[in-house]
């Protein structure tokens, strides 16, 4: 069961939305400080909570997770059912934003780690054009299915992909393998590397702000 997400908006004249998924074991509160630092009042930020589930890799411990993780590497064996369930939940949030008056092409899907995997998975299959994707410290899940399942609507959607050179949770090798797949299928990937581990840094936040301003620039709604 997916709970009510956190919403952050400081302006009545919202004309864009970012749906931002947290990483394994966290919740929607995890990126509230980052959203506040971005200072983008024309954007509504939606921060959903993943459901609790038993995570095989963590000895079956129950925690918030967008899908189960079975092996030592995220792509050793994948929980397609869990990934697809989370995709449907995020698509429902997109539909909600559209109903509230924000068109799909003014919506960005964002996420960190597991959340970034869901952002990529969902965006590349979504049937309407989205404004962009923020894929932070993550990888492309179910990558062997992308060619058959992708939507041409988001073939040219800008993807901001960032990774820490010292990341030991999702290695740079894993991330760059995903980058290569995206580039081979002609996706528009804006690649960034930072001197950090499995986290975010101030330089990255500044680059995220620049990206969001580029794809969701304020339309000055009165």
Ranges and model annotations:
Residues 154-159, 185-187:
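Short, proline-enriched alpha-helix->beta-strand connector loops that line the catalytic pocket
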Residues 53-58, 140-145, 169:
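A short beta-to-alpha transition loop/helix N-cap that caps and shapes the active-site region
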Residues 49, 110, 136-137, 162, ...:
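Alpha/beta-hydrolase-fold catalytic nucleophile elbow
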Residues 98, 105-154:
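Primarily recognizes the serine-hydrolase "nucleophile elbow" in alpha/beta-hydrolase
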